[in-house]
Each structure stands twice: as structure tokens, then as C-alpha cells.
Design a protein with these regions (language model features):
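N-terminal Rossmann-like dinucleotide-binding module
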Residues: 1-53, 177
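C-terminal helix-rich "cap/oligomerization" subdomain common to oxidoreductases
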Residues: 1-5, 70-72, 210, 290-335
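Beta-loop-alpha module in the N-terminal Rossmann-like domain of NAD(P)-dependent dehydrogenases
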Residues: 23, 53-111
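Active-site loop of classical SDR/Rossmann-like NAD(P)-dependent oxidoreductases
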Residues: 41, 275-289, 303
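Hydrophobic residues in well-ordered beta-strands that form the structural core
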Residues: 59, 73, 96, 121-123, ...
Length: 335
């Protein structure tokens, strides 16, 4: 850990596919980061990164670990466990992309390794840093949330085809509704399937929380357009969030009647919409800035290993419910 707050944190990026490239891009711009290098077996990609970001390229990430204090891991999900363990065993702080791992056992191993090494383990649930979600948490703080409704649709692509739509897309919203509901999940039901060979690519899941909140989540890779939305139905309002456009609208009812001087009704106001201002900061920029502050000991991770493990456990149960429809019964143990 850099003791001098004026000295940037030496950081590296492991995996420079689509997401890893953006990690390197943002880190190269952050004042608190010294992007030492990127690690990826693809030499051509590595050369492009060194030219673009002014850092070094490592064919083997292990060769980079002795030169950095922290890493961002953006490799395929199946590699999260071995790569994460190697970094933590080397005493390096870790920000790992979501999901934390491919299985609950692997997630537990990462959490235990971080604790034993005294290292940070932060998980990249990036929507926590979306300006619209940050404002949403403020708006509903004084509201009684009843129903949460999330939609996350994308066109089919060649990325992230090693995991289901639950682990690729829906897990974002699982994490968000857990944060908003602030209660254990006691009921779960899900339906979905696959449009072709490969992992599940469309799912709807319903989560029932101990405090009565119900969340409906839909994720699909069959859409021709991207949708990233979350609505909070509260006792006295409806809050609609668009994560793509970073917008937030609050719908409220009104009960005011307007009449002329002689008592004749002219019109009535049935409701109004508030447009909440949000910042224009890039969520990844905010996430990485937060990670660096955590490395310096100034903040605690917004999403640590335990929180990410809880989201993964629910994702696993949703997948099981889709594959085995007869299992949509109340959970034996609240999650």
C-alpha cells in the first residue's frame, strides 16, 4: 500500500479483452493510478495497449505481480478463481470483474485467501457506481419500497458466451435489488431457456424478501436493442431508472382540483413527474477511483467478496430453477 497519498498506486490489468481494455484506459487517466502494465497472452493486443496507454505488456501475469500493489482482473469467469488466488497469494489487492467466480466454492476460496493475505477483494458490480443508481438509493431512502422491476436486454454477441445470461447480465440486477431491499431472500421462482445451443439466454426471476418486498428481474440476449432499467414501485411514488442514459424520473400522484371563481371545475392535476439530476461521471471511472481509495485505506469496498458471493448464490439458484422448474419453492435458508 502506498503510504504517501501523493504517490500513485502501482496497478496492473490482467486480461485486455473488451472490459479489460476499458480498465486500462481509465486507469491511465486517473491521477491516483500508475498503470504499470497489462497482462494478456495475446501479443498483438498487448502491443496495442502499450502504445495506447504507455504501459508495459506481460505475456504472463505472474511476471507482473511483483511490480504492482493492485490489479484489476478482467479474464473469463472460469479463470477468476485461479488468477485471483495467484494475485492474493502474492499479496496484491484485487478488483475482480463480476461474477466473483464460477462457483460458490471458488468464491469462498477467494474470500478466505484475501482475508489470510490481508488484501482487499472488491468485485466489479459496476452498476453500483452508475450515477442514476446512486440517486435512486437517495430517492427511495425515505420511501417504502414494495416492488422492484429490472430489465436488462442485449442483442446476441460473441462476448461472454461461456456463461448464462444470469451470470453475464442478470447478476447486475440481483446485486442492485439486494442493496435496495435490504432483507434476506426467502422465496425464489424463475423461468427461461435457450434460443439455441449453449448457455441459457433468457430468464425471468422473482425474488421474495423477508420484509415483503418483491423483485422481478428479466434478462435476455434475444433483443435487438439494449435495455438497462430498474423501477422501484413505492407506496407513494414510482421511480424509473435508465442506466444507459443515466436518467431518473419520479412519478407522484396529486390530488389538487382547480376551479373557476364560481366553483365550476376547470381541470385537475392527477400527478406530476420529477426529473432528478445526475452527474455525468463514467461508472467505471467512479468504480476504479473508489478501488484506489480502498487500497489507500480511505474507504471500504462498496461490493466485497461476501456481498458478491451472495449475489452469485442467488444466480446459481435461479439457473437451477430454470433448468429444473419444479424447484421454485420457498428457500429452506434465507439468503
Amino acid at each position: 500500500m502506498s503510504p504517501d497519498p501523493m504517490v500513485p498506486v502501482k496497478v496492473g490489468v490482467i486480461g485486455i479483452g473488451n472490459m479489460g481494455w476499458h480498465h486500462a484506459r481509465v486507469l491511465s487517466l486517473l491521477r491516483d493510478a500508475d498503470l504499470v502494465g497489462v497482462a494478456d497472452p495475446d501479443a498483438e493486443r498487448g502491443k496495442l495497449a502499450t502504445e495506447q496507454f504507455g504501459c508495459r505488456w506481460f505475456a504472463d501475469y505472474n511476471a507482473m505481480l511483483s511490480e504492482v500493489e493492485a490489479v484489476c482482473i478482467a479474464v473469463p469467469t472460469l479463470l477468476h478463481h485461479p488468477v485471483g488466488l495467484a494475485c492474493l497469494h502474492a499479496g496484491v489487492h484485487v478488483l475482480i470483474e463480476k461474477p466473483i467466480a464460477a462457483s460458490q466454492d471458488e468464491a469462498t476460496a477467494l474470500i478466505e485467501a484475501a482475508s489470510a493475505a490481508g488484501c482487499l477483494l472488491q468485485v466489479g458490480h459496476i452498476e453500483r457506481f452508475n450515477p442514476a443508481f446512486r440517486e435512486l438509493t437517495k430517492v427511495v431512502a425515505n420511501e417504502e419500497v414494495v416492488v422492484l422491476e429490472a430489465r436488462r436486454h442485449s442483442p446476441h454477441s460473441d462476448r461472454a458466451n461461456d456463461v448464462s445470461v444470469v451470470l453475464d447480465l442478470m447478476i447486475h440486477d440481483i446485486d442492485l435489488v439486494l442493496e435496495l431491499a435490504k432483507a434476506p431472500v426467502v422465496r425464489l421462482a424463475a423461468a427461461g431457456g435457450r434460443s439455441a445451443e449453449g448457455p441459457i439466454d433468457y430468464v425471468n426471476a422473482t425474488l421474495g424478501f423477508e420484509n415483503g418486498v418483491v423483485a422481478s428481474l428479466t434478462a435476455s440476449k434475444m433483443s435487438h436493442r439494449k435495455i438497462r432499467s430498474l423501477s422501484a414501485h413505492c407506496r407513494s411514488s414510482l421511480v424509473e431508472t435508465d442506466f444507459l442514459n443515466h436518467t431518473l424520473h419520479v412519478h407522484r400522484r396529486a390530488h389538487e382540483w382547480y376551479s373557476a371563481d364560481h366553483g365550476e371545475l376547470l381541470y385537475r392535476n392527477d400527478g406530476f413527474i420529477e426529473e432528478v439530476s445526475t452527474t455525468s461521471i463514467e461508472p467505471l471511472y467512479a468504480e476504479l477511483e473508489h478501488f484506489l481509495q480502498c487500497v489507500r485505506g480511505r474507504e471500504t469496498p462498496a461490493v466485497d467478496g461476501l456481498q458478491a458471493s451472495r449475489a452469485l448464490k442467488l444466480a446459481d439458484l435461479i439457473e437451477q430453477a430454470v433448468e429444473h422448474p419444479d424447484t421454485g419453492a420457498p428457500l429452506c435458508t434465507p439468503i
